[in-house]
């Protein structure tokens, strides 16, 4: 197998096909932000804007600008998405909504902590691309809010009855590990090391289960034990 040939194939497909598709079809040049619901021809079939996906696209084009090539079109795309998120994506106190309508009006309340994580990633990379301190401050403030929510990520929107089956979920330590590295330039080195050690412990010593053949389960009880229920048996291959 020719790995160099494969690497070139993937790079060419990304730079010559995938990215031009999203640059051309996903940007909402009237209201700002991005369309995420596109068919194979680039036609928009739904105009709602989800904070997860808005943040991911800001991050993607910022990261490409930072690490692949200083293309102005990539930076412009990232900045316009970042400005839309900054203006409409949160409640004024960096509690990030789950979704907005096309013009930026909130549709779903900020119940989902992963809206916060993708916003942090977005503004962390955008601050590197632009040198804009405001973007860095948004990333740091949102990260602080995430940490304050770790013990109860959904807060007042938690629909579970307290005390009956308390579980902790794999997704949060997984993404916190990734997130801390994404905003490494904004964190104290000692704090970064502590966060990484905690997350690695959670992933490798709590959710990784050698007795099940080395799989990672999505949920355990608060003491790290397996739970024989739907949630306890859940495995997410993408994680």
Regions found by a protein language model. Name each.
Residues 1-239:
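Glycan-recognition and catalytic cores of secretory/periplasmic carbohydrate-active enzymes
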């Amino acid at each position: 197998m020719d790995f160099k040939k494969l690497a070139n194939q993937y790079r060419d497909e990304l730079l010559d096909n995938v990215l031009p598709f999203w640059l051309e079809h996903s940007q909402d040049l009237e209201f700002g932000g991005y369309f995420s619901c596109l068919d194979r021809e680039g036609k928009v079939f739904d105009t709602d804007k989800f904070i997860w996906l808005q943040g991911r696209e800001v991050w993607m084009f910022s990261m490409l600008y930072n690490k692949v090539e200083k293309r102005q079109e990539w930076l412009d795309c990232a900045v316009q998405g970042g400005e839309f998120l900054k203006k409409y994506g949160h409640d004024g106190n960096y509690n990030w909504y789950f979704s907005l309508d096309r013009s930026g009006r909130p549709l779903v309340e900020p119940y989902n902590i992963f809206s916060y994580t993708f916003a942090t990633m977005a503004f962390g990379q955008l601050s590197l691309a632009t040198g804009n301190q405001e973007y860095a401050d948004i990333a740091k403030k949102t990260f602080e809010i995430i940490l304050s929510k770790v013990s109860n990520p959904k807060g007042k929107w938690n629909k579970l009855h307290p005390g009956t089956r308390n579980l902790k979920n794999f997704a949060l330590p997984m993404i916190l590990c990734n997130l801390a590295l994404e905003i490494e330039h904004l964190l104290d080195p000692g704090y970064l090391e502590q966060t990484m050690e905690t997350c690695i412990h959670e992933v490798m010593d709590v959710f990784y289960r050698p007795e099940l053949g080395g799989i990672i389960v999505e949920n355990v009880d608060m003491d790290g034990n397996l739970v024989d229920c739907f949630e306890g048996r859940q495995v997410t291959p993408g994680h």
